[in-house]
Curated annotation (Swiss-Prot):
GO terms for biological process: translation. The keyword Plastid applies. Part of the 30S ribosomal subunit. This is Small ribosomal subunit protein bS18c. Keywords: Plastid, Ribonucleoprotein, Ribosomal protein, RNA-binding, rRNA-binding.
């Protein structure tokens, strides 16, 4: 039988339904950081309802809880690795000299301006 003439047969393979992300005993609250932080992306953004597999009500509660936790500084607004504190580097002599030259130019301009009056 030709490939195009064969009838389409859907496989009868069973599938396992994924468990809901929130169990019945879990309380959606701004103090429950371990629960809330699961629904944030790598950048610290709130994941969508479709990604989280939430109902509309659950998504609204999670969003409000995350926003409250951010305002109370329990969660960061962003999770950027570039802004982590690094070791302080000592100032070089060239930088000090450059700043000193800028100050001298500023003072010279001030004195010239004031001497005109």
């Amino acid at each position: 039988m030709d490939k195009s003439k064969r009838p389409f047969i859907k496989s009868k393979r069973s599938f396992r339904r994924r468990l809901p992300p929130i169990k019945s005993g879990d309380r959606i609250d701004y103090r429950n950081i371990s629960l809330i932080s699961r629904f944030l992306s790598e950048q610290g953004k709130i994941l969508s309802k479709r990604v989280n597999r939430f109902t509309l009500k659950q998504q609204r509660l999670i969003t409000l809880a995350i926003k409250q936790a951010r305002i109370l500084s329990l969660l960061p607004f962003t999770k950027r690795k570039g802004f982590e504190r690094s070791e302080l580097t000592p100032r070089t002599n060239a930088l000090k000299a450059r700043n000193k030259n800028k100050q001298n130019k500023y003072q010279n301009n001030q004195t010239k301006f004031l001497s005109n009056f």
